[in-house]
Amino acid sequence: MNPYIVLLKPRVIWLLILSSVVGYIYAAQTVDWSKLIALIAVATLAVGGSAAFNHYWERDIDAAMSRTARRPLPAGLIPEFNALVYSLALSAAGITLSFYLLGPLPGLFVALGWFFYAVVYTIWLKRKTWLNILGGGFAGNATFLGGYALGKGTVDLPAVLISFAIYLWIPSHIWALAYKYRHDYRKAGVPMLPAIIDEKKSVVIISILNIASAVYILWLYLAFGQSLLGLALVFAGVAGTVATSILALKEKSDRAMWKMYKASSPILTLFLLALVFS
């Protein structure tokens, strides 16, 4: 894959772009395809730009961790200055176009999403506190709320409640992955939760958070969803997440934690698709 594409973190940002799209479709009475295409383009630029900036800012961390050492910057595939200019150009284009093409309120959420990931998470918190992902997680809320605001023209309580499904899922997902690579994070000096506390405590916290996230998603769909097919999708994701989280609590092993990570990964996607079916 082209290293400039890798900088965008396509395997990560597609879910945030999907949350914007789902927010719009869920809120809009009818889908305006020109608005939807503009939303996808703007989200790709802004979210991809923030991801590329994260690559640039964390290039020393990536070089110190075996999982990330082959990324474009530590591997020397792209000059550092080029990566910085590329990330800022994409970000500026995405934020500017969001106000022009989508309007002030969706544009505000696009800008806030970029700010929470690129500044709050990447610059301010990542290297300083285990709360980093809790601060940066609001970028996930912003993606859904931006799409919702485009579809409805405003943001209401249901939109905020639904957006917190993303917020709760992010730390449970990231910390489960960080548990597997906790030694890498310690070596790099990054205070991710599983790298700084007792391993058994990490398992308990992450597993309970996964269960709480799954239960919250199920409640949201029962409250705001309208499709039996959607409910079936959500229930499948919830069942897999809860079952593997209970297994992790019982075994407290690396194998069980990885099973939980893999099983809980699809639940947010299933929930978002279920909202579309509604």
Swiss-Prot record:
Belongs to the UbiA prenyltransferase family. Protoheme IX farnesyltransferase subfamily. InterPro entries: Protohaem_IX_farnesylTrfase, UbiA_prenyltransferase, UbiA_prenylTrfase_CS, UbiA_sf. Pfam families: UbiA. It is a multi-pass membrane protein. One of its GO terms (cellular component) is plasma membrane. Carbon 2 of the heme B porphyrin ring is defined according to the Fischer nomenclature. NCBIfam families: cyoE_ctaB (TIGR01473). PROSITE patterns: UBIA. It is found in: Cell membrane. Its EC number is 2.5.1.141. The chain crosses the membrane at residues 12-32, 33-53, 83-103, 105-125, 130-150, 157-177, 204-224, 228-248, 257-277. GO terms for biological process: heme O biosynthetic process. Converts heme B (protoheme IX) to heme O by substitution of the vinyl group on carbon 2 of heme B porphyrin ring with a hydroxyethyl farnesyl side group. Keywords: Cell membrane, Heme biosynthesis, Membrane, Transferase, Transmembrane, Transmembrane helix. It catalyses: heme b + (2E,6E)-farnesyl diphosphate + H2O = Fe(II)-heme o + diphosphate. Pathway: Porphyrin-containing compound metabolism; heme O biosynthesis; heme O from protoheme: step 1/1. It is an enzyme of class 2 (transferase). This is Protoheme IX farnesyltransferase. GO terms for molecular function: protoheme IX farnesyltransferase activity. Its main location: membrane.
